[in-house]
Amino acid sequence: MKKQSIFWIIIGLMLFSSCRDKDLDMTVLHKTLFDGAAITEITAEDAWNVTIVQDAEKSFVELEYSAFLEEYLRVVKEGPELKIGFSRYLNLPANTVKNAIVHTASVQKLDFSEAVTALLVGDFPAAMLEMELDDAATCKGGSFGGTAFLKLNDASTMVDFCFNGLFCSLKLDDASVFKGFLTATDSMSIHLEDASRLTTYGGTTPVAIVGVRDSSHLNMVKTTVTNMHINVSAVSEAVVNVSGTLSGTVTGVSKLYYQGNPIINVDCDDLSTIEPLSSSNF
């Protein structure tokens, strides 16, 4: 009898939830906010779909959302920062519409979390960019110069990102993924941890400081580096392209493959390998 009661309670809750979803007003509404306001920092959360368009002529925010979300919208501007999210946690139906399009001349700080999907459109003329992705957020596109500090956490993903500037710092952890083009005329710093993965499509830099650990994988064969210091450890793998000096360590059942004809000064333990890149090992 007790099992039957639990069964009917579960069925009742499922039916109640289904009825509530059917009662939601899914009409798509549109709203324009902050026309002409300067926006240089954007924070988004709660699984919003956010498109950021580089627009030198006008600045505003377009919202497209399901009508039932009206009372929960939390889209505010505090100084130069735009915040996009909801006022409370919502268990949303799969067909819920929650899109934001931000037109702005330049951005200096981006913070995406809680499964936000972001798209960057255009060349952004910021002197410095700080960008962080958390909680399985994803970001695609965008072109930046100057200096950039990028951090990806908690299985976040960044693809088709283009940096062509002075200095770039990139940190990935917790199975995060980066794919993009990197050129830094001064230097770059790249660190991967906890099964993260990085692949570059091209680029150059005179100096690169690289760390790859905890079953992570780095492929920079298409980015030409003059001098690189790299530490590969804890069952990780790195593929690099170095023309000058290659220094560092390879430890803990790890592998380092290199392209080019560098001067090598790398300490390698007995369980790890360092060898030239060839068709047989890549």
Regions found by a protein language model. Name each.
Residues 161, 178-282:
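Short, surface-exposed interaction patches in beta-rich subdomains
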Residues 120, 128, 138-139, 157-158, ...:
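Short stretches within intrinsically disordered, low-complexity N-terminal or propeptide regions
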Residues 19-132, 140-151, 159-169, 186-189, ...:
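Acidic (Asp/Glu) and glycine-rich low-complexity loops/linkers
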Residues 114, 134-135, 153-154, 173-174, ...:
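Asp/Glu-rich intrinsically disordered low-complexity tracts
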Residues 1-30:
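Bacterial Sec-dependent N-terminal signal peptides
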